Every structure is written in C-alpha cells, then in structure tokens.
Amino acid sequence: MKPAILVPVDNTPVSKEVLRFADDWAARVSARLVVLHCRSAAIQDLIERGELQNPEPSFEAHLQALQLRSEVEIVHLFADPADGILKLQDELEPELTIMAAHSHTLAGRLFLGSNTDMVLHQGSTPIFVYKQTQRDPQQVVVPLDLSSISESLLRKADELALARQGKLHLLHVLDYPEIHVVGGGAFYGVAIDGGFLQERREQLLEHGRKSLEELVAQVELKSPYQLHLDFGTPYLQALQLAERVNAGLMVIGAHDHTALGRLLMGSNTDYLVHNYEGSLYVHQELQS
C-alpha cells in the first residue's frame, strides 16, 4: 500500500487550494491522500434528528469535482478536529500531515485555531502548514541550531527546495557574547573595550560559519544555498531574513519521540507558525 498523506479540511475556500497542493505532493512522492472531515457530536445530533442535511454526499461530490490525480480515501469522524487528526496519525502513521491556514488577512490564524497548536505539540508526523501567500515559493529559509536533528532537517529542506527548483537560505543565530566583570563594583562603573567585543563577535561568527559549512558538506546539498549568521533572537532573525529574501517557505524542526511535540526552538517555533506569512514545513524524525 502507498504511504499516506493526511489532509484535514473544513468548509473554507482555502481547503480547495490545500487539496490541490496535497495532490501535487502525493503525485510527486507516490503517496495516497487520506482526507479527513470532522464534525461535532452536536452537528451529528442535528443530522440524526433531520434538522440538518447530511453533509457527506455533497462533500464527496465536491471532492470528486476537483478531479484529483491521487488515490483518495475520505474519512468522516464525529470528533473535534485536533482529536480526529491525532487519532488518524496514530492509526495510519502517515508520512506527512498537510494543514491549511488562512491568507494574510488572518495571517497566522490556522483554520483549526488552537487545535492546530495541539496537533503541532502532540502530533507524531511532520506537518506542512499551507498558507496563501504572494511570497516567492522558490526562496526557502531554514533556521538551524546545529542540534542532533539538524542533519535530517537539512536533508529534508534540500529535498523540498529541489522539488520547487528553489534556493536554500541557511540561518544560524548566535547568542551575544557574555561579558563577565570582576571587581570594581557597579558604583564606579566599568568600561568595556569595544574592540574586544568586536573581536569576540567575529570569533563566534567564524566558529558558527565553520560548523555550518561542515554540516552542509556532510549533507552534500544539491540545491543552491546561501549561509546567514547573526546574533539575536532566533524567531526574529528568521522572520527578518524571510522578509529580506521574500521567502515563501520556511523549514523548521521538531525533536523526536524523546521530547515529542517539543519543537527545537521552543516558543520561537510557535511564534513563527503564527506570524510568518509563508508556508511552513515542521520537520520531525519519524520512528522506524
């Protein structure tokens, strides 16, 4: 059986776009689509009492009208969206979950709302957060913290960039150098040598660049790429870089089952998911 791509949808216009996007993805990787449509127990009660028409036939007709190329399985669940997604992730073990987000008019507000946060933190698959955007889909920003997940994250980013004939922008954000002052006391003040600080920053940048170059050499990237190093807050630097290069995709990482749902940049990743104007691929190493 072909591997599955899970696609939760609702009744918003963006769902049509995300289904076509997921269809292209499935065709490229020879996967099948599992389209999930959830409805609450209250809605189901109205249907059973005859006060509301069963939406399943019209939903399936709408899906058929899209003329998707991939093999499609439709799953209707009586559940909250997040619970339904997590349930199917456990049952099907899909290789990817593709979820939609609204356009820039509601940037960062995912169509499942807080349920999406729950899926991001408790889910067991990589997640692609699709957003309607005017940004360049061929420019791909990849924040890297050089942790254990960075190699597999970079390989996935390279694969995604190749599929869209894109360019990778590899970002490593450094902490500002620490200054330890001994003696003198705060009353008198202490003069810090600006030349020393500049030298220390240059040393940290050089060390970070070498580490990033070693990672790139190990992965043997096939896509064109550019290295970016800076000091500051990771999510702010990532957003600023994405703005400068007009990036339509950002690839970020999540740890494996040893810290399930804890994204490598912690709250930084939550901020990016809700504030970045392009699509995001949240990478997670799957268990064999």
PLM regions and their residue ranges:
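Structural beta-alpha unit
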Residues: M1, F21, A42-L46, Q53-N54, ...
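Gly/Ser-rich helix-loop-strand patches that form or flank binding pockets
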Residues: D83-R135, Q240-S288
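Alpha-helix-centered segments that form part of catalytic cores
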Residues: L205-A217
